[in-house]
């Protein structure tokens, strides 16, 4: 992850976010829900290389869209992709810049994995800009993760992907969520029980 710089850029309204997407030739924008992704795509749809992905698309259409995205990136053509957070898992695009709506630090790290993936660009030219969407609240299930991320962004702004920042993030998250949701011993016990056939 030393291939990218991660910066928290604060609050962005959708108009400003759409302008960021217009100003960059190749950019990935990841938001926390598909309605937000659609709204942003609609704002930049006239731009060359504008793409939108959603889980509502048929798998065949998603694969075709991702193939076009990879081809455009490789050829150096304009490519502006807006998608909800599922794109973080298993999509192998290599963007020079990623914009990521606030979420957990692990999600920000996943977005960083889509930026300068092949390490061909200088780190200074490869950045992940994390923003707080003014027009969209984080989904309830992400609220605590987002709040803890903001705390870490204030205290570790120099390197949000440093081991110290990651450790601090998970420590604070553990304190906030409590033993019930992040209890490793309970998880291991459940796995051992399942391995013995539920006995």
Show which residues each predicted segment covers.
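Residue-level signal for beta-strand positions within conserved beta-sheet cores that form or flank
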Residues: 2, 77, 124
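Short His-Asn-centered micro-motif
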Residues: 3, 8-9, 31-32, 83-84, ...
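Interdomain hinge/linker at the junction between the two RecA-like core domains of SF2 helicases
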Residues: 1-22
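C-terminal helicase lobe and adjacent C-terminal extensions/tails of nucleic-acid helicase motors
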Residues: 15-26, 30, 35, 39-66, ...
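Conserved P-loop NTPase nucleotide-binding/switch module
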Residues: 90-92
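Conserved phosphoryl-transfer motifs of two-component systems
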Residues: 97
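Conserved two-lobed SF2 helicase motor
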Residues: 73-88, 100
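A conditional alpha-helix N-cap/helix-loop micro-motif detector
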Residues: 10-14, 62, 80
């Amino acid at each position: 992850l030393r291939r990218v710089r991660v910066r928290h850029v604060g609050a962005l309204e959708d108009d400003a976010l759409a302008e960021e997407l217009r100003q960059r030739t190749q950019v990935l924008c990841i938001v926390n829900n598909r309605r937000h992704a659609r709204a942003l795509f609609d704002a930049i749809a006239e731009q060359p290389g504008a793409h939108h992905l959603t889980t509502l698309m048929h798998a065949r259409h998603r694969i075709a869209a991702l193939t076009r995205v990879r081809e455009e990136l490789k050829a150096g053509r304009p490519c502006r992709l807006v998608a909800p957070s599922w794109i973080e898992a298993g999509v192998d695009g290599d963007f020079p810049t990623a914009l990521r709506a606030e979420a957990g630090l692990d999600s920000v790290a996943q977005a960083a994995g889509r930026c300068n993936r092949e390490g061909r660009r200088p780190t200074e030219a490869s950045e992940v800009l994390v923003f707080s969407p003014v027009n969209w609240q984080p989904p309830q299930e992400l609220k605590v993760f987002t709040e803890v991320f903001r705390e870490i962004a204030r205290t570790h702004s120099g390197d949000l992907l440093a081991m110290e920042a990651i450790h601090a993030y998970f420590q604070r998250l553990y304190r906030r969520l409590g033993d019930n949701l992040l209890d490793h011993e309970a998880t291991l016990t459940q796995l051992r029980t399942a391995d013995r056939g539920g006995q």
